[in-house]
Amino acid sequence: MCVLSDLLQYYAKTDPKKFIRYAHPISIVFLFAATVFFFTWEVFFLLPDLIGTEGWFYKANWIVDLVIAYNVWANMLACYRTDCSVARLPKDRLVPGPDEKHLWHHCEDCKQLVPPRSWHCKFCRCCILKRDHHCIFTANCIGHNNHRYFFWFTFYVTLGTAVALVTNFAYMVKYNILLHGPAFIFNIFIWISGSNSPMVKYNLKENVVFSFNLFSVALAGIMLVNQTCIIYRNASFYKREGRYDLGLRKNINIIMGKAGLWTFLSPSIKSPLPHDGAQWQLRKIIK
């Protein structure tokens, strides 16, 4: 993962325009394909075999999977459509007051003073309010105004892949694929060698899906843990200092807005943020 991350950062720095031209659509198509695949695999293949299609439990799983898929895509779309740039501030807020001018810094690219915690993004080509990072899956920067959507995006991606993993595991245990089926690497070797054994192909399919599912839930889980730590300290991806940490309740309110954790229900829930992202209260340090 570190090698992949370094490789992506290298190409991003080399040619930002070309990078986002390909990285954004590829990432979004991949996410869409993965969501549709896991939903279809679980609802139309695994669950009918495990619990049938007549009972209430199957219908409940349908609803849960639909809610998860909706929140993945709705939060992703909200991230994409929300403007976090400094330029969105009212004109009177683009100029710092006398008592806060020392907290602002000059952006060489934008040629202007920008608020604290605002940083320039070479992909968006503007300064972002409380910039966290640029996300290729949402094709936008994650900042003050859309951080809430990004957190729930990572939450529901993790939840969805975790539910799929549990269902996959139950299916494989039912048919003893984990216990008696050939090992994953051995399956690939046999498949490449051209074996026509139906059991080998059957186990290969299940093992490939399970391995991809395991990788997906691990990657999404790492993202979720990282974002949880950021919210806990009111920090950002590149700035982990605790100078803006005002306590868990206030930190949640700053990122999630007035509705707080109820925003997990849907990105359409109105939840005004406590401020516009230009002024940040520092933590009081008692000596």
Predicted features, each with a name:
Residues 1-287:
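Membrane-associated feature with strongest affinity for ZDHHC
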